[in-house]
Amino acid sequence: MFEILVIDDDRSIQMFLKRMLEKQGYEVITASTGEEGILRTLDSPPALIICDWIMPGLSGIEVCDRIKKDPKLSTTFFILLTSLDSVADRVKGLDAGADDFITKPIEQNELQARVRAGLRLHQLSQDLHTQKLLLETELAEATEYVKSLLPLPVKKPLNINFQFLPSRQLGGDCFDYNWLDPDSIAIYLLDTAGHGLKATLPAISVLNLLRSRALKDLNYYQPSEVLAALNNTFQMNYQNDKYFTIWYGVYNRVSRQLTYASAGHPPSIMLSGSSPTNTEVKRLKTPGMPVGMFPEAKYVDASCYVEKSSTLYIFSDGAYEITQSDGTLWSLESFIQILISLQYSVDNQLDYILNYLIDLNSKENFEDDLSILQVKFD
């Protein structure tokens, strides 16, 4: 049974509305002031509120404003009872959050119809809210599952650490590193287009495929061949129109050679040197379209020698495509400058980087997954 709250300082109108609505099968409670109405609403949220506009103390529009600002009461349907019928007054009521109006003197059939319509919308809002909570629960479970698939940080013979902060909707970031032999390690990070499970599932598929080395007769030491094989396997026509960017590298700790290839992914950043004044910055990126976008896409390798005490950062675009408080978008160049400034000033750079990005972000949650891999070679 739906519960309806009537707020009116006129006792006769209270009783009139109570009797009429109870005949329709509703449970009706009453309040004589706005303050009392708010307390009753907080104690037991009704499905619908009918509130007089002009009352001593809190007015109906003030009651409406307070109730609608409470997230727990957002689905409560609010009807303002008023003798004011100007457009300006109705606009003022709508701005406060009112859902409907009933003009005095009250016409019974109109009131009953508006209450029925309001309760239908309340039920619909409740159903949508329930579905939203279920979806958020599923996304939270999916987030935990993705986290469980990620590798653990390592300290020897390389020091590899990471930060992974999924967006509220969960995106398509995934990464891994594994030894191909005692001297060579493959490191990669990918970012699937879009959000939600449709983006996450292809990323998990790629992770499992590369981790198990299920692509037979593939030279996993050759990054360009790996990307070409992934492009043949994950054409977006067969993967829900989802494509992904990826950076894939293989490091040999004996020769200190890093061979890499990228597919539409941001450049990885290699920092070498002993102080901020003599830091060498290398942007490691090769030409190549995102995987799955074009069947005939070509990928090429590049390589570099890793100097002593170098650090490599591999990241998704969520690390720098951040909306600031002034509405502007942060940049890759600014992100690189943060990496350089922290390279020699602190030990746990990733913690400082993440805190800086959280403070920089103007929104409650990040719009995209944020993934950063850090590889310290010595």
Q: Predicted segment positions?
A:
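Acidic catalytic/metal-coordinating carboxylates
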Residues: 2, 32-36, 47, 59-65
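Active-site beta3 strand of CheY-like receiver
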Residues: 44-50
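… and, occasionally, acidic/histidine-rich disordered N-termini of signaling adaptors
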Residues: 129-312, 364-378
